[in-house]
């Protein structure tokens, strides 16, 4: 058997594009893409850690990214979706946050949240600047908060008829740490009333209101529904697919998938 036909085991690897280019084994979940599109525009998925949530959203980002329009075969040629592409393939700019990077120490929390959001918004501007008018990045950075920068991106993209897919990984990482380490009072400061995290989700809802808004889709993952319940009472546009039978095998392995993996491994021993 030729060496390049043997798939590597991508232990700890959640970068879908690297996994594909390095010829690593991938349990194909791309047949869920049409179901995700049909389900709703703004989705929440709760699963335990180490279940493959990050790999899933990295796959979705690779599929929907407008910058990958010419790399479909390279990234998905071996997947189910290659023979069944949807109309939304490569139609979005991808805006991503991963809140595991936020410092949960109460004295640093809000500042760290702003820093993380700013970093991701700068990455977004660098990646898609060619789609906007000259001076877009400079105008974006003249705004002083994550909320005003999000609003500027959304309004500018809407005017240009561009589309945004927002992905948030580990949305509840720092809030779970606050609750378990610093207690309920500190947790409530961020997630209740005028708390900054609750306000962030209110802003997201606002950015989807109106006709022709660029922020068209969201996919948000986490490990617990606790924060979801606390910050999203005003964000009542999201659909929680966690317990939906349709998405039971969206992440993790089924018995059939695991058996197939083991059989291929035995063949190559």
Language model segments and positions:
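Walker A/P-loop-proximal flanking segment of P-loop NTPase domains
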Residues: 1-64, 68, 73-82
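P-loop NTPase motor core
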Residues: 69, 73-123
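Short glycine-rich substrate-engagement loop in P-loop NTPases that contacts/grips substrate
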Residues: 137-152
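Substrate-engagement module of ASCE P-loop NTPases
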Residues: 152-157, 187-215
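Conserved P-loop NTPase "ATPase switch" module shared by AAA+ and STAND
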Residues: 161-190
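Structural recognition of the conserved hydrophobic beta-strand(s) that form the central parallel beta-sheet
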Residues: 167-169, 199, 216-223
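Short regulatory helix/loop adjacent to the ATP-binding pocket of P-loop NTPases
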Residues: 213, 226-241
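Conserved small/polar residues in nucleotide/adenosyl-binding loops
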Residues: 267-269
């Amino acid at each position: 058997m030729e060496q390049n036909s043997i798939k590597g085991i991508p232990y700890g690897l959640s970068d879908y594009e690297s996994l594909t280019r390095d010829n690593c084994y991938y349990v194909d979940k791309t047949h869920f893409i049409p179901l995700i599109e049909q389900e709703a525009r703004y989705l929440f998925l709760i699963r335990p850690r180490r279940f493959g949530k990050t790999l899933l959203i990295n796959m979705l980002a690779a599929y929907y990214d407008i910058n990958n329009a010419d790399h479909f075969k390279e990234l998905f040629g071996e997947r189910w979706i290659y023979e069944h592409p949807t109309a939304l393939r490569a139609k979005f700019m991808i805006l991503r946050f991963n809140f595991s990077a936020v410092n949960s120490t109460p004295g640093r929390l809000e500042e760290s949240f702003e820093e993380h959001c700013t970093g991701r918004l700068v990455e977004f501007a660098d990646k898609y600047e060619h789609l906007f008018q000259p001076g877009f990045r400079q105008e974006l950075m003249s705004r002083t908060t994550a909320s005003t920068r999000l609003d500027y991106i959304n309004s500018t993209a809407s005017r240009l008829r561009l589309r945004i897919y927002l992905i948030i990984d580990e949305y509840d990482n720092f809030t779970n740490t606050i609750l378990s380490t610093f207690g309920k009072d500190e947790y409530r400061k961020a997630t209740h009333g005028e708390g900054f995290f609750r306000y962030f989700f209110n802003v997201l809802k606002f950015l989807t209101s109106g006709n022709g808004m660029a922020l068209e889709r969201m996919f948000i993952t986490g490990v617990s529904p606790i924060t979801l319940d606390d910050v999203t009472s005003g964000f009542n546009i999201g659909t929680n697919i966690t317990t939906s039978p349709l998405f039971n095998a969206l992440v993790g392995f089924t018995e059939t998938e695991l058996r197939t993996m083991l059989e291929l491994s035995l063949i190559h021993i």
